Amino acid sequence: MSLRSERVGEQLKKEISEIINQKLKNPNVGFVTVTEVEVTGDLSLASVYVTVLGEEKERKKSLEGLEKSKGFIKSEIAHRMDLRIVPDLKFKYDESIDYGNKIERMIAELNRDK
């Protein structure tokens, strides 16, 4: 990933987080945290990794809500950032938090068994 795409990714992360938490009025989108944004080298696609507070049902509902709100989020980004072309957004669930929690539970169980 180039330096420019990394910088754009970091700025997108900040802006998308702010838009979701302050501007987005979709009731299907619950407590969402943007954990990472990866932008392609040509800045045409941004993979937005999010975590959602809640169970599988809330996670699916929030991801669907984000997909439906993609146009609004892109228009807000266009107003906030000086980009010739706003990247297409692809929302993905970040499973690294769940994986970390699973490892932590396994370690705690091992320590308890000693």
Curated annotation (Swiss-Prot):
Keywords, ordered alphabetically: Cytoplasm, Ribosome biogenesis
One GO molecular-function entry: ribosomal small subunit binding
Disulfide bonds: none
One of the protein's GO biological processes: maturation of SSU-rRNA
Keyword Cytoplasm among UniProt keywords: yes
Cellular component terms per the entry's GO annotation: cytosol
Subcellular location: Cytoplasm
Signal sequence bounds: none
Main location: cytoplasm
Alphabetical list of InterPro entries matching this protein: KH_dom-like_a/b, RbfA, RbfA_dom_sf, Ribosome-bd_factorA_CS
One Pfam family of this chain: RBFA
Family of the protein in this entry: Belongs to the RbfA family.
Subunit structure: Monomer. Binds 30S ribosomal subunits, but not 50S ribosomal subunits or 70S ribosomes.
Function text: One of several proteins that assist in the late maturation steps of the functional core of the 30S ribosomal subunit. Associates with free 30S ribosomal subunits (but not with 30S subunits that are part of 70S ribosomes or polysomes). Required for efficient processing of 16S rRNA. May interact with the 5'-terminal helix region of 16S rRNA.
Protein name: Ribosome-binding factor A
Gene name for this UniProt entry: rbfA
